[in-house]
């Protein structure tokens, strides 16, 4: 990996070692990314890999070092890991808070979600908006869960399947409440695709 460019060897290594456990608890998962015991407002989940090593560096460069070109590598990884999706699926980014958009100069997950939608020739819709500017990076699990409940709002959406795209799954609070607001707004079903899963030993305060 040089700068924000992911070489083929690194890319293939991430894909070959893709995340295969339950996105919520890490135990062996059934077909769609959740074990039989875990319940979530999303029906299916996919994850590229654990947030470590090269994948962690790629995400950090994209989020914190303005390495906008890393978007292309992340779209490639999502495209490689996710199976074929039905034509009617709509791709929705988990929105970034406005202060971070101003700081970076772009909404990092909106770019990824739009790029993935274009790659798969699927519809893209920025259906969810941030209702608050709370920053979750570095907060405790309890704080994340409390903040996430008031984090999002969404206008009415047509019935259908919506795929939420986010960068990191830590406690799951963000995508759970984002999925909740989509369902309340009219979505028939919500699926999620995340670039990385925070290692379980570090989920409390990251």
Predicted segments — roles?
Residues 1-206:
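Glycine-rich phosphate/pyrophosphate-handling loop used in enzymes and phosphotransfer proteins
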């Amino acid at each position: 990996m040089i700068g924000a460019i992911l070489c083929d060897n690194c890319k293939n290594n991430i894909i070959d070692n893709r995340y295969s456990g339950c996105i919520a608890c890490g135990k062996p998962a059934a077909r769609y990314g959740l074990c039989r015991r875990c319940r979530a407002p999303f029906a299916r989940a996919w994850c590229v890999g654990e947030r470590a090593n090269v994948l962690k560096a790629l995400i950090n460069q994209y989020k914190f070092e303005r390495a906008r070109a890393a978007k292309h590598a992340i779209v490639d990884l999502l495209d490689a890991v996710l199976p074929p999706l039905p034509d009617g699926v709509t791709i929705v980014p988990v929105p970034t808070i406005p202060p971070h958009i101003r700081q970076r100069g772009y909404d990092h997950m909106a770019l990824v979600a739009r790029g993935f939608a274009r790659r798969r020739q699927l519809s893209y819709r920025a259906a969810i908006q941030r209702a608050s500017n709370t920053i979750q990076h570095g907060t405790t699990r309890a704080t994340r869960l409390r903040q996430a409940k008031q984090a999002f709002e969404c206008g009415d959406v047509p019935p259908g399947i919506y795929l939420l795209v986010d960068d990191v799954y830590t406690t799951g609070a963000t995508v759970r409440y984002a999925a909740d607001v989509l369902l309340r707004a009219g979505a028939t079903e919500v699926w999620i695709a995340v670039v990385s899963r925070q290692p379980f030993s570090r989920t409390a305060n990251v």
